[in-house]
């Protein structure tokens, strides 16, 4: 079995990638169903914003992966990838600040079920970013 060189293996980039893929897949898993995009009680404009949110999750994830894995590694690319990877989760958390918002539709309890995914995802980005920064700084 091949031994992994920890100094060369970009585990931090893998952590950020896991967060990005989770965002891309998770937004569709959570919203492509009868409670969201296929909800007959939702007006077309609400579905428009839901579709926009799913597409935004995919676009941010693809941009993250591009900046993370493109040739010519750099600290700037890592910084960009980490910021982009965090945008979806941070904006999701900010939704509570807007009037009349709820984390779920009635009759379900508004207990922010998204937090069990959003906080670990942001944690992966943070740990991945710090780990990769450390790895890059040791290579110099």
Task: Give, region by region, the residue ranges found by the protein language model.
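Non-cytosolic membrane-interface motifs at loop->transmembrane helix junctions
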Residues: 40-47, 79, 105-117
């Amino acid at each position: 079995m091949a031994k992994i060189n920890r100094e060369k293996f970009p585990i931090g980039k893998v952590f950020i990638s896991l967060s990005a893929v989770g965002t891309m897949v998770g937004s569709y898993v959570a919203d492509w169903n009868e409670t969201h995009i296929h909800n007959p009680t939702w007006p077309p404009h609400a579905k428009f914003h839901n579709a926009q949110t799913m597409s935004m999750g995919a676009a941010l994830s693809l941009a993250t992966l591009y900046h993370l894995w493109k040739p010519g590694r750099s600290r700037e690319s890592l910084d960009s990838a980490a910021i982009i990877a965090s945008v979806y989760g941070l904006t999701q958390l900010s939704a509570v600040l807007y009037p009349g918002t709820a984390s779920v539709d009635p009759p379900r309890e508004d207990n922010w079920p998204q937090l069990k995914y959003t906080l670990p995802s942001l944690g992966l980005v943070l740990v991945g970013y710090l780990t990769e920064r450390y790895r890059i700084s040791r290579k110099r």
